[in-house]
């Protein structure tokens, strides 16, 4: 036995080594370096990570809504081993585990952190395990894992081994409770550090812990340390075997320093001088053997070589980009700057010690490249703070002026010319509306800068508005129009025409927030220039202005006035009255301070506060709640009897929230009751710091996540909101305006879905009581605020988790214990399990005693048995019993704690009689019989082996003798017999005649290629074809099924049915050669032609996938016209009429199974071979067959019978698909709801803008009784007048095969006609699961306005439909 155990251990070690080495990505291969990645909105965007081995920057995966777990299947990025900054995961739905996505991510450097953290997992609602089992080093920063309600395996990871430097600052809270997690680590994951503990990422992956001698760096699978220059592991002992390098990597080798003639780049790799970025927009510096973006402190760019840095002599020149100084914070951006590359514009209205602050921040500026403008700086008295200014180059000027001073009410002095010498290279001076600035002060500057005084005009320097205190008279300026939106106001006013047009310098638009009306233009100002008014200058040639960046639902005061020359005639100025306007409403921010508590086992009470920014009149709130499903199968794997169970505390009641229950902080007063002890100052300070830090982190997260998109003109999203998507999370809300404001207790809405997301609307209240909930269950709660204006939408969700209280009697064992069997020294007992326990039963306690014994019943230690073991053995067996009477009782234990003990049950164990009975024939076995049985069994075994070898040989090499199977179009390959075989025939094509050109996409059995076939078509030496393949890993049965489904088309010869060109069945891989349909399938064709202006459709994942298809390059982007739709409908009906004439029932007619040729002719094709590509269009029955329920007729859904008339129903759905450009039928309904809806007589609604005549044809196809539906020939007859003339030449309807057929009238068809072939897909009693339909676009018709509503088609309705 020990030998066997030892061999098993060696095999396991070897397997671990192979797997480890197979997953390892050695760095000595070619690196594929990617920049920072921000992946959001769609799962498909993850493919940007393909081939990346190192991300030099951060990786953010966030805000992916409406995704399911299966959407991530097939996605894996094993090449990625290193991230140099941080890794952020935030609100990604459907993602449960990272082990498959990033199996080899080993290092997160943390060069730049996300708010002090290198790894952040925040509000990942579906995440169950982190699973980064290769992660070995976080070299800088900490870990923050918070608010992940399903995340387990956190206590089985020792982060001190991974993030040693930031371990003390790790923040891991508000995830799934430990006692609710399985957290099962295999025995090989047990280490001693310093105490014995199990460390693993999941049940199949241990945490890698290296010996102390290796300094956290060891090899995978075998013992041994990595080279000292490695981090993240290695696959060998040298510096070339590292997964990642601790210092620098160069040519696949990890080094402490870069070699000569190379430069350190981004602190991780060595590059040559040529590789250091050197472009027009980015000139990196070569300094001290580093390639860096800017010169370090104390150095400046070399004048002769911009690639080098030279040490400064004295004050180091510092170049800065120009900009506006409108506050002290803005001035601080120029601290230390000596050269301004651009303009220096100062417009500062006030502040404490403003001159000192400006001198400290702007006092070193020596040169300005463009111009200096001092505009409306009411707090300035002098410009002496620009004490070092020596040169204004005037490369770009403000309307021709290099020094521009306008409207500075308190400016009295310019510069101290005894210490200042300013040169202006180009441009003039401009001084206007500086009432305290004397003219001689201005002329002094004119002289100092070297401008001739005679070159100065009144247009440049006003003789009347500088140094004067004169009041100007104003004419009335009329505001003609005010338009508002949620964040801007558009003003239009009457044109002002002074006697001399040159007198008008500009208009000034002023605005400010105000709650009241009746203010004047001087309100909000003081003598120091502090003002609440904001102003904009507008060109004198314009009489309109757009004020942007405003707050929604806010009242603003508006004023327009003119600036004219002071020397102009009386009445040359004008201003308007102050008018008021309110911006439009917008969606509010999410509700604040959501608190959920439970006061009973079936109730949750939710309270919240209004949004910080209601942005309108918040009238109601939508509260959504859904019970969190528990993975019972996984949770039962934990051995609760060994580890013990800490009862889970449900969500607190209101009293618990208000009062602190911790006993050490309580004291007793005179009446014996407890009161809360006051907290110490240190405790209060720590709580305040933690709360402030938490708020600061979440603000940082939201401000960095919800950033404004590039090229986006609308206002950026408000922070702390969920993103707005094309399909709002609250799109199915129901607003009941008659609901009383006092009705706050709302029971959950009944629904067939066993665990739906429910919602209720709360009007004019900030609390709701949810009743009828399941006891001791965790619910995810979302509270959404909505304004009265439904058009602006609702807020993002405020999300909380809460658990109802336990039901005290739910864990009690119902009924009595049954003694199933008593045998020798054992008794098998069975008892019924609790019907509806608190969460789930984890184990049972069993107490038994022999009656008459002297030990006390209550003092006996109970036995413990896990629930899953009890279920597996159908009871519990007590062994090692001696004869006598016994008494036993049981109790169940759930996550809520122990249930009540059951009643006593007694049983009797008889004394065993061990003496043999010579008269018992069962105890007498003849030796001859035993020998005969052994020989017979050996012979049977030999015969079975011989038969197995013969059968496998026949299956593998006996293809020539295998008969053909039955051929028919199968939606469900699982239902085909495994005996179906394929025999090569005249359709066989030599493999060498087929040439593959490029991939077109993935098919049901394998890849589909575009190719060329030689000498396959008569008189055509080379033709383009589509080649379907079967995967090399496919089984023999799958290859035969692949060939048999292709064989269906061998008997077809119709222009509107895809033609089979040949089959290559000999050798591997198996090929099926088809007619090339250059524009792909009709579903993607329609989606590629959706108009771009349909925002929510053209941006959908399905539309993007269709537009990125290989077929798109053969296509144009114009949507099909109504005439095109009718033409497509006609040719599809013609192809189906041919199949009906051949007694062939398609059973899966849909746009996905129709193909489009280069000339846009549509043909019936594929016959069941596309179901894997569009798996979301199918519905799996009982884990087996895939059914296209959204295209199936009522009789097919009810009894599983398919005829050509059921194909006509599917044809009507195809017409609906074409009218909506391939929207999904029955959107918003689950597959089970669709099944019931159709069986009950429901049909698809008319798409918006769809012509009545086309919808009438759809309804004809959707007649409930199949005998009332038209045949495909009748449909062609109806449509033929609208079809192109070429149709008559190629159609089956006009062919000799159909010649002489009398048009089939509807009344000629028997009600229960069995003329067509009937096939039964599934038994009538089949059960259907309630899998919801996948998210899809809102149905629409692209034909709005393109034709009269009544259409131009003369639709002839068959006689029988008139009844």
From Swiss-Prot:
Its cofactor is Mn(2+). The modification Phosphotyrosine is found at residue 1174. It is found in: Membrane. The active site is at 1148 (proton acceptor). It is an enzyme of class 2 (transferase). Disulfide bonds: none annotated. Residues 721-928 are extracellular. Its EC number is 2.7.10.1. Residues 1-29 form the signal peptide. Belongs to the protein kinase superfamily. Tyr protein kinase family. Insulin receptor subfamily. This is Insulin-like peptide receptor. It comes from Branchiostoma lanceolatum (Common lancelet).
């Amino acid at each position: 036995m020990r030998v066997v155990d030892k061999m098993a251990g060696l095999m396991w070690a070897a397997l671990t080594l192979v797997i480890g080495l197979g997953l390892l990505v050695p760095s000595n291969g070619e690196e594929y370096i990617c920049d920072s990645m921000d992946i959001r909105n769609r799962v498909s965007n993850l493919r940007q990570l393909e081939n990346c081995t190192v991300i030099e920057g951060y990786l953010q995966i966030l805000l992916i809504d409406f995704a399911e777990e299966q959407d991530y299947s097939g996605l894996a990025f094993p090449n990625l081993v290193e991230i140099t900054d941080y890794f952020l995961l935030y609100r990604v739905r459907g993602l449960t585990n990272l082990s498959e996505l990033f199996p080899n991510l080993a290092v997160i450097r943390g060069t730049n952190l996300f708010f002090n953290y290198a790894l952040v997992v925040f509000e990942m609602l579906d995440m169950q395990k982190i699973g980064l089992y290769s992660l070995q080093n976080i070299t800088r920063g900490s870990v923050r894992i918070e608010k992940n309600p399903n995340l387990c395996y956190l206590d089985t990871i020792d982060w001190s081994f991974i993030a040693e430097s930031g371990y003390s600052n790790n923040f891991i809270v508000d995830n799934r409770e430990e006692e609710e997690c399985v957290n099962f680590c295999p025995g090989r994951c047990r280490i001693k550090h310093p105490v014995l503990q199990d460390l693993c990422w999941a049940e199949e992956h241990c945490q890698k812990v290296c010996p102390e001698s290796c300094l956290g760096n060891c090899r995978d699978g075998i013992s041994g340390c990595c080279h000292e220059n490695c981090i993240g592991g290695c696959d060998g002992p040298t510096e070339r075997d590292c997964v990642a390098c601790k210092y620098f990597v160069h040519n696949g080798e990890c080094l402490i320093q870069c070699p000569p003639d190379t430069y350190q780049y981004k602190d991780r790799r060595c590059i040559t001088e040529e590789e250091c970025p050197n472009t027009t927009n980015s000139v990196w510096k070569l300094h001290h053997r580093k390639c860096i973006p800017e010169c370090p402190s104390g150095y400046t760019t070399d004048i002769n070589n911009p690639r080098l840095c030279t040490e400064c002599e004295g004050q180091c020149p510092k170049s800065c980009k120009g900009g506006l100084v409108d506050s002290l914070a803005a001035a601080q951006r120029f601290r230390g700057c000596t050269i301004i590359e651009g303009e220096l514009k100062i417009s500062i209205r006030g502040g404490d010690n403003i001159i000192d602050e400006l001198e400290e921040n702007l006092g070193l500026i020596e040169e300005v490249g463009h111009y200096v403008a001092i505009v409306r700086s009411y707090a300035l008295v002098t410009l002496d703070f620009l004490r070092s200014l020596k040169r204004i180059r005037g490369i770009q000027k403000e309307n021709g002026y290099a020094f521009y001073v306008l409207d500075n009410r308190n400016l009295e002095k310019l510069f101290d010319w005894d210490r200042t010498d300013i040169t202006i290279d180009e441009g003039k001076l401009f001084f206007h509306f500086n009432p305290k600035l004397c003219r001689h002060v201005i002329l002094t500057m004119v002289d100092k800068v070297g401008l001739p005084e005679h070159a100065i005009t009144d247009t440049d320097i006003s003789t009347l508005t500088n140094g004067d205190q004169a009041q100007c008279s104003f004419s009335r300026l009329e505001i003609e129009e005010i338009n508002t939106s949620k964040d801007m106001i558009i003003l239009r006013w009457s044109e002002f025409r002074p006697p001399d047009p040159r007198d008008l310098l500009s208009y000034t638009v002023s605005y400010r927030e105000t709650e009241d009306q009746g203010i004047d233009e001087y309100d909000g100002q003081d003598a120091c220039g502090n003002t609440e008014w904001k102003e904009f200058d507008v060109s004198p040639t314009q009489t309109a202005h757009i004020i942007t960046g405003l707050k929604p639902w806010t009242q603003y005061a508006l004023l327009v006035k003119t600036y004219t020359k002071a020397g102009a005639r009386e009445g040359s100025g004008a201003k308007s009255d102050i008018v008021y306007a309110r911006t439009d409403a917008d969606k509010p921010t999410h509700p604040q301070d959501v608190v959920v508590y439970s006061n009973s086992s079936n109730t949750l009470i939710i309270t919240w506060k209004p949004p910080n920014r209601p942005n309108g009149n918040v009238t109601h709130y939508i509260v959504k709640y859904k019970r969190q499903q528990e993975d019972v199968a996984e949770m039962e794997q934990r051995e609760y009897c060994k580890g013990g169970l800490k009862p889970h505390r449900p969500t607190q009641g209101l009293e618990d929230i208000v009062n602190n229950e911790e006993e050490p902080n309580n004291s007793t007063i005179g009446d014996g009751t407890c009161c809360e002890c006051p907290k110490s100052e240190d405790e209060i300070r720590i709580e305040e710091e933690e709360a402030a830090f938490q708020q600061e982190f979440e603000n940082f997260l939201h401000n960095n996540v919800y950033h404004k998109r590039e090229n986006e003109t609308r206002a950026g999203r408000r922070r702390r909101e969920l993103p707005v998507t094309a399909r709002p999370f609250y799109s199915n809300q129901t607003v009941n305006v008659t609901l009383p404001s006092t009705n706050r207790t709302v029971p959950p809405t009944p629904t067939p879905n066993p665990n739906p997301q429910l919602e209720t609307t709360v009007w004019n209240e900030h609390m709701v009581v949810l009743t009828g909930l399941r006891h001791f269950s965790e619910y995810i709660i979302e509270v959404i605020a909505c304004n009265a204006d439904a058009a602006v939408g609702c807020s993002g969700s405020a999300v909380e988790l809460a658990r109802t209280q336990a039901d005290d009697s739910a864990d009690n064992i119902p009924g009595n214990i049954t003694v199933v069997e008593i045998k020798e020294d054992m008794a098998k007992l069975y008892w019924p399990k609790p019907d509806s326990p608190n969460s789930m039963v984890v184990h049972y306690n069993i107490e038994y005693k022999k009656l008459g014994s002297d030990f006390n019943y209550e003092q006996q230690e109970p036995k413990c048995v896990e629930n899953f073991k009890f279920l597996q053995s159908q009871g519990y067996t007590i062994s090692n019993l001696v004869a006598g009477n016994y008494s036993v009782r049981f109790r169940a234990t759930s996550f809520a704690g122990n249930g009540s003990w059951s009643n006593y049950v007694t049983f009797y164990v008889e004394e065993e009689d061990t003496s043999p009975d010579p008269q018992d024939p069962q105890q007498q076995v003849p030796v001859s019989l035993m020998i005969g049985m052994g020989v017979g069994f050996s012979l049977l075994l030999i015969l079975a082996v011989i038969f197995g070898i013969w059968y496998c040989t026949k299956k593998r090499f006996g293809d020539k003798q295998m008969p053909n199977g039955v051929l028919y179009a199968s939606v469900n390959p699982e239902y085909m017999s495994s005996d179906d075989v394929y025999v090569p025939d005249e359709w066989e094509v030599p493999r060498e005649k087929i040439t593959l050109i490029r991939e077109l996409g993935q098919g049901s059995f394998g890849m589909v290629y575009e190719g060329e076939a030689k000498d396959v078509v008569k008189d055509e030496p080379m033709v383009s074809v589509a080649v379907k393949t079967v995967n090399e890993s496919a089984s023999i049965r799958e290859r035969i099924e692949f060939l048999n489904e292709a064989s269906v088309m061998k008997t077809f010869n119709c222009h509107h049915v895809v033609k089979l060109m040949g089959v290559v069945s000999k050798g591997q891989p198996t090929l099926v050669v088809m007619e090339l349909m250059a524009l792909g399938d009709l579903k993607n064709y329609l989606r590629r032609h959706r108009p771009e202006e349909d925002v929510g459709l053209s941006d959908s994942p399905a539309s993007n996938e269709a537009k990125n298809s290989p077929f798109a390059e053969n296509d144009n982007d114009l949507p099909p016209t109504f005439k095109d739709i009718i033409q497509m409908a006609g040719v599809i009906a013609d192809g189906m009429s041919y199949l009906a004439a051949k007694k062939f029932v398609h059973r899966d007619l849909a746009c996905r199974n129709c193909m489009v040729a280069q000339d846009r002719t549509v043909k019936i094709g594929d016959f069941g071979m596309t179901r894997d590509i569009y798996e979301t269009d199918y519905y799996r029955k009982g884990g087996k067959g895939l059914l296209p329920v959204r295209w199936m007729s009522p009789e097919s859904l009810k009894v599983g019978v398919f005829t050509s008339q059921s194909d006509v129903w599917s044809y009507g759905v195809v017409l609906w698909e074409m009218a909506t450009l391939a929207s999904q039928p029955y959107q918003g309904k689950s597959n089970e709801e669709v099944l019931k809806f159709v069986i009950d007589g429901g049909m698809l609604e008319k798409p918006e803008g769809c012509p009545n005549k086309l919808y009438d044809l759809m309804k004809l196809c959707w007649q409930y009784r199949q005998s009332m539906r038209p045949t495909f020939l009748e449909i062609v007859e109806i449509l033929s007048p609208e079809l192109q003339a070429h149709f008559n030449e190629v159609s089956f309807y006009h062919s000799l095969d159909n010649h002489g057929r009398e048009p089939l009238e509807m009344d000629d068809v028997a009600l229960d006609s069995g003329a067509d072939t009937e096939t039964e897909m599934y038994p009538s009693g089949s059960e259907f699961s309630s899998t919801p339909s996948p998210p899809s676009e809102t149905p629409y018709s692209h034909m709005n306005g393109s034709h009269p509503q009544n259409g131009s088609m003369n639709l002839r309705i068959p006689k029988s439909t008139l009844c």
